[in-house]
């Protein structure tokens, strides 16, 4: 009984990290000051070795919860939250992963097999250096609603499949967008039938919708997170996240056919009429009986907010969480209006920003397909960066 109590007390001290020497307000103030000076407190991944990582990841690679850096049991350790350089190193009254000693990646102290030790964290590596980059191939074949293209031109494109409920096999469900090694962003309305995660499959690196590719990567789904305030009448908050299942912290392997898209900065606002791209395996037009066999791309322009209202969309509800984009070309030279259509839902609307293709929207809804002067409607990604970040945490 005595040993059990000691073990419990040890765990409480290690995990909770009782702090007596600094008032909580001062500790938080120092932490905030250090975060602003030396790194982004909202970061969901680390760059290089992670020395400047100031995010809130707090789980080790083995799944253990990190110990508070201000724990009394760390006082004699080289690195702790009360050392003179603590703020500069990102240490303080928290249990977030850090790299104060220049190790290969962020780490923290944990309890493993009742022993006190340090362990590397499962924080993802930032793909900023390569996100949104591609080997673009100029499309050679035109199609109604867009252009046939190759997956290397849109390596962040995902294809989501669902098991049939009343028969064997599976069916193509929606498009998706790879935003990090283990996470795919998509549209909430794709999951109105409430598929359990084990009935979903994600394919990356595929040019043809149902024909396997040589470099494709296939994953089962660990989690399906639909926005808690998704409105299936108006499609407000039309966003969802899929966590890919893998036996290691790394899921998708980067290649010319598979690469994450860059997420935008929260304050990113591109000029009206900026040309952007969409991609997907959807129908060629509303009356098409089948989805496209090959990936297609479309070229559209961002509409001003004054043109993205119910007035221009047959009195359909348009909220501040939506943006509009459409093909503004017209005349005999451009009889084919580029637009998303059924089956493209959940796919990307991407625009060039700082020499990287960047995700601006998620294909959500529209009035018909390829109708002249009627834009498609997309989920505005900049409004959901906090939601994405919070749900990607372990």
UniProtKB/Swiss-Prot annotation:
GO cellular-component term (any): extracellular space
List of glycosylated residues: 315
InterPro entries the record matches: Kringle (IPR000001), Kringle-like (IPR013806), Kringle_CS (IPR018056), Kringle_sf (IPR038178), Peptidase_S1_PA (IPR009003), Peptidase_S1_PA_chymotrypsin (IPR043504), Peptidase_S1A (IPR001314), Serine_Proteases_S1 (IPR050127)
Coiled-coil parts of chain: none
Gene3D superfamilies cross-referenced by the UniProt entry: Plasminogen Kringle 4, Trypsin-like serine proteases
Pfam families cross-referenced by the UniProt entry: Kringle (PF00051), Trypsin (PF00089)
Signal peptide: 1-36
Domain Kringle: 45-126
Single GO BP term: platelet-derived growth factor receptor signaling pathway
Residue span(s) of domain Peptidase S1: 143-393
GO-annotated molecular function: serine-type endopeptidase activity
Keywords: Disulfide bond, Glycoprotein, Hydrolase, Kringle, Plasminogen activation, Protease, Secreted, Serine protease, Signal
Catalytic activity: Specific cleavage of Arg-|-Val bond in plasminogen to form plasmin
Cystine crosslinks: 45-126, 66-108, 97-121, 131-262, 174-190, 182-251, 276-351, 308-324, 341-369
Domain of life: Eukaryota
Subcellular location: Secreted
Chief location of this protein within or outside the cell: secreted
Purpose of the protein: Probably essential to support the feeding habits of this exclusively haematophagous animal. Probable potent thrombolytic agent.
Protein name: Salivary plasminogen activator gamma
Origin species: Desmodus rotundus
